[in-house]
Amino acid sequence: MKDFRVVFSLILLTVFILGCTQPAQPTQPQPEEKIKVGVLIPETGLYSSAGVAMKNAAELAAEHAGNVELVFADCGDSPEKAKTAFEYLVSQKVDAVVGAYSSPQAMVVADAAGENKVVYLVSVASTGVIEKKVTEGNRYVFRTAYNTTYWGVLAAEFLSLSKPDKYYFVGYDPLKTFNQGMLAKINELYGEPELEVYYKSPSVSPDDYKNVAKQIAERAGERDAIILGDPGGVSINFLKEYRANGGKGIIYSVGGALALPATLKKLNAGYTAFQAAALEETEKTDLTAKYFADYKAKFGEDANNYAGLLTYDSIMILSQAFEKGGKEKLIETLESGSFKGAAGIYRFNENHQALWGSEELKGTIGEFVNGKVEVVYPPEFATSQVVWPE
C-alpha cells in the first residue's frame, strides 16, 4: 500500500509539472469596440453639393478617430426624406446620428431622435427651435453648428471691420427663414440694410438670380458691401452676374461654395469675403492642419466647406465622448465635457448648443484678395485688414 501511495504521488507530481510547463495558448485579440454613427447627408436635391463635402469629411473623421463605424443615409432636401433616412439609420442600430442640412429637416429629425432615444448632433441647421426642443425636455439633441444668432454676429463683425458706406442683404428664398433670422441679429448689432432682397431657386425661376444681381449692381457703390445669404452653387452664378453687370464693393458670403480658394481663384473673385468655421491658416487645434491637409490629399480639393468641417468635428466629438464615457453615457459626457475639433474646443451650454463665440471656439472670416485668402477675423489669426477695391 505504501508503494502504491508513492507511485501515485509521483504520477500526480509529474502531471502537475507537465501542466505548468505547457506553452500558454495564444489569446485571440479582441476587436476594438466602436461607436456606430449614422450620417444624414443630402446626396440628392437642392443641397447635394454640400452633401459631397459632408460625406468626404465623415469618412476622414472615421479614419482619424479609429473607433467609429459609419452608416450613411440620403436625407435629400425635405423633412420627409430626412425622417425616412433617420428611421433607416435607427433600423441599423446606430448609437448616434449627425447631419441633415436644412432647419426643417433638423427639426423633424430632432423629434424622431427623442422618440427613439438616439443622440443626434445637428451639424448644419441653425434654427432656434433646436434649442427650444432641448429646454422642453429633449435631451438627445445637441448642436455643434452655429445657431442663427451667431451667423448674424459674424456678418455684423465683418461690417464693423469693413465699415462700408451702405450694405445690401441678398438672401436665397429656399433658406429665407435662416436668412431672416441672421439679418435680425445684424440689424440689432450693426443696423439695417439699404435693401433686403431674395432670389429664387433656378428650378423655380431660372433667371431670378440674374435679375437680383443686376438690380444690386445698379445701386451699390464702391464702398458698399453685399451680404450674400446663399451657401450653395447658385451663389457662384450670382457673383459672376453681379461683377459682369459692373457690381462694385465687397461681397460677403455665408460660405459654402464661395469659401473654396480653388473656386475663388478660378473665378478671379477678388474682394470676396466669407465666413468659415476654420481656415487652413487658423491652427486652432492640432486637428486643424491635419483636417485640411488630409482632406486635400484624400479627395483632391480644398476643405473649406462649412457643412463638411462641422460634420467632421461632430463625428470627432462623438468619438471622444464614447472614449471618455462609453455608449451608455453619451448624453452625460457631452453635457459635461470638452471636445477637440478642427474648428476649436467644443463645450455645450444648458441648451446643448456649442459655445460659438467663446475664447476657444470662434468662427473665421477670410477675404480673397490678390490671388489668395487673407484672414481678417478673429484678430489672433488675422493676416490682413479688410481690403477694398481701389
Describe each PLM feature range.
Residues 1-30:
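Secretory targeting signatures
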Residues 43, 62, 138-204:
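An alpha-beta-alpha
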Residues 49-54, 64-132, 144, 201-207, ...:
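Beta-alpha junction/loop-to-helix N-cap segments that form part of ligand/metal-binding clefts
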Residues 82, 143-168, 208-209, 235, ...:
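Hydrophobic alpha-helical segments within soluble ligand-binding/sensing domains
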Residues 113, 118, 179-277:
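Extracellular/periplasmic bilobed ligand-binding domains
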Residues 239-312, 379-389:
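Extracellular/periplasmic periplasmic-binding protein-like sensory domains
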Residues 298-305, 319-375:
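Segments of small-molecule ligand-sensing domains
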